[in-house]
Regions:
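Nucleotide/phosphate-binding catalytic cleft detector across ATP-hydrolyzing
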Residues: 1-51, 58-167, 181-190, 194, ...
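Gly/Ser-rich catalytic serine loop of serine hydrolases
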Residues: 170-172
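A structural feature that tracks compact, well-ordered secondary-structure segments
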Residues: 175-177
């Protein structure tokens, strides 16, 4: 059995042998005898389609940093399959195959995550869910989907009796679930997250989105509001758009709560946050600062990052796979 986080920015697989991660991205180059030979020699993963080579995963990200005029392509956009990328399906299949391989036994279970339906745009998740299931099933597995934020809650709310609010901040979407004793009472997503930050930083600072992402993830600075450490122009832009994103998320949460019948929790509940976009230094300080400026309809006991935020959703998928197996 395995858990698989199918994120816009990263795919993460978890099983009894540990965790494996791959960037959900590709870089397209023209095919020549020399480039094909070099990629094979260096064991760089790629897919050949229509006489073009798609370099896959982490290597694509690294190549994009070296060749500044090359933009990364994404099989997914805003949490779902990218409708502008005709080669998304074979690229995704190669990424998934590289992480989980082919099933070693018949109908081995894989629980994979899908986003909640976004509340700020008209878009369904059914096609996205079906395509991922088709790819996973084609490798000999039996695939079952779970909501991304619920998966995060299974990993991060265990000490709270699986009760609280889980927020998964990925590259394409922010997903939220309110859980009580392991059951979801409300789940949804908003279509602004890490990629939205990259796009705005890139536009305002005159750099590529790949460069903006690299700066955002570098980890050599903090976006904490109370920090007096000097930031570069690009780092300041990252801070600005993180604050804007959190404000947007909290406003949408408040609006959703106001229009939905809320559960009556007997005690204050925690908010736990995970996902790659939550890993920037000082993020939790930004979230707490913006949270304190809002009227929240539930009493909150604490706000914290889950352990290993990048792999938490995949771990929750694996927990669900284990529960189903038993």
């Amino acid at each position: 059995m395995k858990g698989l986080d199918c994120g816009t920015g990263n795919f993460v697989a978890v099983d009894e042998n540990g965790m494996r991660l791959q960037r959900n991205a590709f870089l397209t180059i023209d095919k020549t005898t020399t480039t094909t030979r070099q990629l094979n020699l260096l064991k760089v993963p790629y897919v050949e389609i229509n006489n073009r080579l798609h370099i896959i995963g982490k290597k694509a990200y690294e190549y994009a940093q070296v060749f500044g005029n090359k933009e990364l392509s994404r099989p997914m956009s805003q949490g779902l399959l990218n409708p502008t990328e005709q080669d998304a399906f074979p690229v995704l299949r190669e990424i998934i195959l590289g992480l989980v391989g082919k099933a070693e036994k018949e109908k081995e279970r894989i629980v994979y995550c899908v986003p909640g339906k976004p509340i700020d745009k008209v878009q369904e998740v059914n096609y996205h869910e079906d395509v991922l299931k088709q790819i996973i099933d084609s490798l000999g597995y039996e695939a079952r989907a779970i909501n991304e934020a619920i998966a995060l809650g299974l990993a991060g709310l265990q000490t709270a009796g699986l009760t609280g609010i889980s927020i998964s901040m990925g590259a394409g979407m922010c997903n939220l679930a309110i859980m009580y004793a392991g059951m979801s009472t409300l789940e949804f997503s908003v279509a602004k997250s890490g990629d939205w930050i990259d796009e705005n930083v890139a536009r305002d600072c005159g750099i590529s989105s790949a460069k903006a992402q690299y700066i955002k993830e570098a980890g050599d600075y903090t976006i904490a509001p109370t920090s007096d450490v000097e930031r570069t122009r690009e780092q300041q832009a990252v801070k600005t758009y993180y604050e804007a994103m959190v404000r947007y998320l909290l406003s949408n949460i408040a609006n959703q709560f106001a229009s939905t019948s809320m559960p009556n929790f007997p005690d204050a509940v925690p908010i736990i946050i995970g996902g790659g976009s939550s890993m920037v230094n000082g993020f939790i300080d930004v979230f707490k600062d913006q949270f304190q400026q809002k009227q929240f309809p539930l009493e909150i006991s604490e706000i914290k990052l889950v352990d290993e935020p990048l792999t938490a959703v995949a771990r929750g998928c694996y927990v669900e796979a284990q529960l189903e197996e038993n």
